[in-house]
Amino acid sequence: FIGDSRTVGLYEYGQIGEADVFADNGMSLFNLWSSKTACGGERKTLEQLLGENSYQTIHFMLGINELGYSMEEIVKQYGEAVEKIQEMQSQARIVLGANLHVTGEQSAESDIYNNQRINELNGKIEEIGREKGCYYFDVNEKFDGESGSLSEEYSVDGSHVLGKYYADWLSWLQEKG
């Protein structure tokens, strides 16, 4: 699993088990290759982790922290990251995860971190997945309300699900394959 604070939530509350997790609060495409996170008790870069291990499946979910950049730059960085992961783990099935929506209130309060931009980015991520032969899963179908926003019953801060729902998220991923 590679990702940001939402992936940290999956790790801390989702009962991932023995899976390696390269995630941190604030992780982005722009610091992905220079960051180190604790994996297996040792702080490593993503390049070290991918170089030392062989994975069957890699879940990749980044993008929300990048929304302050131009969509063109985000898509460029995203595509390059996927290509590098594919080069280093050619046998792995790569699953690109849509970015979780924010609540309607959170979306209305921001010109940058809103569901319109998240949907635009998710569409671009889905395109990258098609172009590069990756799978794409959109967890918003699990947590959105009728308005197409993260349902407030699942969130306190407007952008993350409550800890007790990360296990549901992981189960949903497992059901999707």
Language-model segment annotations:
Residues 89-93:
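A short helix->loop->beta-strand "cap" motif at the edges of active sites that frequently abuts
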Residues 1-77:
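Conserved SGNH/GDSL esterase-like catalytic core that processes O-acyl groups on lipids
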Residues 78-82, 122:
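Generic structural signal for well-ordered alpha-helices
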Residues 61, 97-98:
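Alpha/beta-hydrolase-fold catalytic nucleophile elbow
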Residues 102-177:
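Catalytic His-Asp segment of secreted/periplasmic serine-dependent ester chemistry enzymes
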Residues 32-36, 64-73, 85, 109-115, ...:
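Second-shell loop/turn segments in exported
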Residues 50, 85-87, 129:
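N-terminal cationic-hydrophobic initiation segments that often serve targeting/anchoring roles
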Residues 22-25, 97, 137-142:
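Conserved beta-strand termini and adjacent loop/short-helix elements that scaffold enzyme active sites
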